[in-house]
Design a protein with these regions (language model features):
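Gly/Pro-rich hinge or "lid" segments in bacterial periplasmic/extracellular proteins
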Residues: 27-28, 45-95, 99, 109, ...
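Long beta-strand-rich cores associated with HINT superfamily self-processing modules
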Residues: 357-382
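Ligand/substrate-recognition segments at binding pockets and active sites
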Residues: 201, 221-287, 327, 355
Length: 382
């Protein structure tokens, strides 16, 4: 199974660790064997990164595709323009578009300008602060899509002073999440108390986490920092809202004696040279089922454990949750994991975003859902 190959380094490897064997029963059936009880395993298989593909195609399928979708790869250029041509034999019917061009534009501001000038017809990552640019303009349509995606700030728990859980919690307590929702997202987001679990997920733990400056100062003093701490937040425009989030947090943290400097870094190299490299950096994740996101972002052995958080009791909690067949007990276990994150986590998650999608008014029949669920064969352009 390719996803479990350590040389591949898939972030979904930890989530699929329970799978021991996959047996082909017939042309439409497979039998999956697990080494433990896993009540929600069918949910895991809905992950957008898990696919059944032809044997031996793993190294090339990302560039070539296999021709079963509504569009076929004609030209692949990860740093330029990838061209997709309509698949006339698509099982749900021929697409309404002859071609789709996917243009790589790493910088958020540049993407907005490309939309305004007509270089592109759709931008699914427009900051809400720029919504007014498109509202009332007959050349564009705007759509707000609620999601479980989140933006935040990650502190490496293996690096001082963030190796002290009291310091990490103090930083998180000093943040006014509702103010971030209002100022950064224009109200179009759902407050999170540092849980990565989507607001719509059945295991979501809803908590109150109002800003607590006195509590933050108290924790810093207990940790040996009565005069506060200094930190540098590494930011880029890879995610257009990151600079604004950092600027708002800078003012909020100062109230608790936390001096935060902001350092801009190149967007193009952010994931390779900043994220999981610097002591404090901005982060973003797409929605996943509760079990997947808790394993991928926080389990001790996870490749994308961005805060380097390690806790044997937390790992055991997740294992117990997976194997619990009683729904109420399973829910309690997943929620206990989220309570632990509120106390100990290195990642500050202020909110889950509603996504602002802006398209040219020429684009028709675009589903108001996340990109992975769009029925692309129905989309047309006048």
């Amino acid at each position: 199974m390719r996803v479990k190959d350590p040389e591949i380094g898939s972030p979904a490897k930890k989530s699929m660790s329970a799978v021991t064997d996959i047996e082909v029963v017939d042309s439409h059936t497979v039998k999956i064997k697990l080494n433990t009880s896993f009540a929600d395993f069918p949910l895991l298989l809905t992950d957008y990164r898990l696919r059944m593909i032809p044997s031996g195609s793993g190294d090339t399928i990302g560039q070539t595709g296999i021709g079963t979708g509504p569009f076929i790869v004609d030209k692949f250029d990860a740093e330029g323009t990838t061209i997709l041509k309509a698949n006339p034999d698509y099982w749900e019917g021929a697409p309404g578009l002859a071609e789709v061009h996917v243009i790589a534009i790493p910088d958020g501001e540049a993407r907005v300008q490309a939309l305004l000038t007509g270089q592109i017809d759709m931008n699914r990552y427009v900051p809400f602060a720029q919504k007014k640019i498109f509202d009332g303009n007959s050349k564009f349509n705007t759509t707000v899509v609620p999601t479980g995606n989140w933006r935040g700030m990650v502190m490496r728990t293996d690096t001082a002073p963030f190796d002290n859980p009291k310091v990490r919690k103090a930083v998180r307590m000093a943040v006014d999440r509702q103010e971030l929702v209002d100022l950064v997202m224009g109200g179009a987001a759902t407050v999170s108390c540092d849980t990565p679990v989507s607001p719509s997920d059945q295991y979501r733990l809803n908590m109150n986490c109002d800003q607590d400056i006195n509590g933050a100062k108290k924790l810093l003093a207990e940790a040996g920092y009565p005069n506060g701490i200094e930190m540098t937040i590494h930011v880029s425009t890879k995610e257009p809202t990151w600079p604004t989030i950092a600027e708002v947090m800078q003012q909020q943290l100062a109230k608790a004696g936390i001096k935060a400097d902001i350092q801009m870094t190149p967007s193009k190299s952010y994931w390779k040279e900043t994220w999981m490299k610097k002591a404090v950096a901005m982060t973003r994740w797409n929605e996943r089922p509760a079990d997947s996101i808790l394993h991928e972002a926080y389990h001790s052995g996870a490749k994308w454990n961005e805060s380097f958080y390690k806790s044997t009791s937390f790992d055991k909690n997740l294992a117990d949750a997976r194997g619990e067949l009683d729904f109420d007990k399973r829910k309690k276990a997943y929620q206990n994991a989220q309570k632990t994150l509120w106390e100990e986590a290195g990642t500050m998650i202020p909110y889950h975003v509603s996504k602002l999608v802006v398209t040219s008014s020429r684009v028709k029949n675009l589903d108001e859902v996340e990109v992975f669920s769009v029925r692309w064969h129905k989309v047309k352009v006048d």
